[in-house]
């Protein structure tokens, strides 16, 4: 009898303990929802985001004395404004990259800025790629700054995917100033991404084209990719934030988490269509470095835009014609 009574008392205690735990749990949940409701009643407050240093604006002033070494000659070669040249110089001087990649060379204006800024960086080297085989590609480096040639390798006549495995990985910094029309820089970024160090610095020129006269020519690619890449952004000082025309992104770690987003960015309406041999090179290249879902997105995007570009030809296709002299001829007439 005593044993039964003792057992009953223990059961009552256990029941009470369980009941107390459940009551506390319900109270905690109710309090949580009350707090959540009042915090979000009038919309979420993002004002605290100003304390998060996601954007740095000072690279154009960083060790600008290095840029002064070439300032007098660079105007003959570069299509960038002086503050943009200083910004590119500042990026190299601050981060001291050893392995740098450049996509889009023309006469070599940005190549000269990079090469000049990296001269005292031990074991540094610049690898530059341009689709064109025009004789003026890189001509300013060769003719005006030949003493920079020992730190420079130039690849021409094909898409970046053709050269990346030869150039190799562990790239610290990239500067892209290539097509501007979609897919342009979006496609370029996807090609180079597997070869970058985890927190590499990736720069783009003409990221302000969305509100300049270039808007009329749909030169949106650098603007799109610069803004969707996950990482800390660096922009020039002094400019209106909407018109800043050059910028760098210091990549977040684990970029593989975001590659599907980057491939989706290719899904817009392309303003030009690469030739079929280039498409095949890029497709086979992607198969080595990206998953099946990415490849499917690429194939579907190519299929759609092949037809779109046929029906909506863009007049300014000269940028992508590697056998044409029209870009340089057009520049000369200005």
Where are these regions (language model features)?
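Intrinsic-disorder-associated, low-complexity terminal segments enriched in Asp/Asn/His/Tyr and depleted
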Residues: 4-7
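S-adenosylmethionine/decaboxylated-SAM
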Residues: 74-79, 85-334
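Terminal export signals
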Residues: 1, 29-32
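N-terminal Sec-pathway targeting helices
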Residues: 13-28
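Residue-level detector of alpha-helical secondary structure
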Residues: 9, 13-16, 56, 283
